[in-house]
Amino acid sequence: MLKLIKTIFFAVLGLVILIGLCAQFALFYSEQTDLMDGEDIPNCTSVFDSKYSTQIEHSRLILKSMMKVCDLPALSVAVSKNSKLIWSEAFGFSNVEDKSPACPKSIFRIGSVSKTLTAVALIKLAEEKKLDLFEDIRGILPEYPDKGFSITPIQLATHRAGVRPYNDDMEAFTTMHFNSSIESLDRFKNDPLIFEPGTNFEYSNYGYVLLSAVMEKACQKNFVSIMEEKLFTPLMMKSTTPEFNDSSLIDVVTFYDNETPYSQDGLIHKSPFIDHSSKLASGGFLSTAEDLIRLADALDGDFLSQESVDLMFKSYSSQLILHYGIGWMMARDPYLRKSYFHFGAGSGATSVLVKFPYYDVDIVILSNLGHAKFPYGHLMPFMNEFLPRPVYWLFYFIDFLVLIFLFKIVNRRFFRPRVIS
């Protein structure tokens, strides 16, 4: 019997070692991407900290290669370290047809990263006692029909209110104009909730539309004015604005989509007209990479209280390894580095905003191609340039120490000869 236990133990031990080695090799191999030549892609630099020149040069090669792989018309990137902008650069063409080069001041759609902006403004209103995150919204917004349950702002902000998502992609492509967030409630306010608030999670753009209507009513101002007063003006986000198809706006890139949705065949066309007035809070803002870095950096300062920041980055829902806070997703990357982030993907837009809180690194990537799939083999090596280098031998060494520790425990528990007196 003892021999059988030993055999099973060493078999399991060997399997654990094998699985660990295979996982680490797969992680290492997944990042070994052959970079495509991007010398023909124009680039324009705004900020370049010479202290990070090596990392920036490597990142240029990676991002240009990613543009080739994904057929991105333009891409804008900004990186900050310790709340200081160390790199801002744009690549490619803001308009493919006339070959207008993109630059760091080019303005992109940011898609669902708009939710992060809305969430920060919401927390600011809560700090100022303009609304209570935990009180029923109907006390503020009686225009929203009674659903038989209490719905709170924090439930809306964390996608736990039971407000339905889009039934199909076409709901995001509306051309109907609305004059306020309250008016845009007509699109869904009479629909039933899909679950009792607080009992489940369902990512909902309409939930954020309802949240913006609550903010409007609480402040007796339109949503755009609230965002400008509480966020854009104090943080000097001068290029962040709602997308109202205003022809007077300059520096706005041309938006493109793949001819075959979600494909990577290289065939693109201009995005169709969309009126974003009904979904500003969930996906209707324009911005630059530098403006979004200002927002990310501000959360490390005194723009919000530490209590508010902790509330924002608290996990309210989890799906496997992904957690959702107030306008932010949270997860650990393959190297177990904690990150706060949000993605944006829609017609004419793909965006990424990431904070690595333990390393004081913030990163923004914007593109004017809708639903672009940034490959892990490019995205992770790019971010690794500005983070502590993954040390693969350290993983092996830790594995070895853990296995020795387990071996000693098991050996002491089961295999030590008994002394019979």
Per-region residue spans from a language model:
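Catalytic loop of the DD-peptidase/beta-lactamase superfamily, centered on the K-T-G motif
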Residues: 2-89, 219-221, 228-229, 233, ...
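Short linear capping/connector segments at secondary-structure termini
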Residues: 44-45, 93-95, 106, 136-143, ...
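Short, conserved clusters of charged catalytic residues that mark active-site
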Residues: 58-62, 139, 210
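Short active-site loop at a secondary-structure junction
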Residues: 69-76, 97-155, 194-206, 280-283, ...
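Solvent-exposed coil/turn segments that connect beta secondary-structure elements
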Residues: 82, 94-96, 161-162, 247
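A short, polar/charged loop-to-alpha-helix boundary motif
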Residues: 94-104, 373-382
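Short, surface-exposed loop or secondary-structure junction motifs
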Residues: 148-345
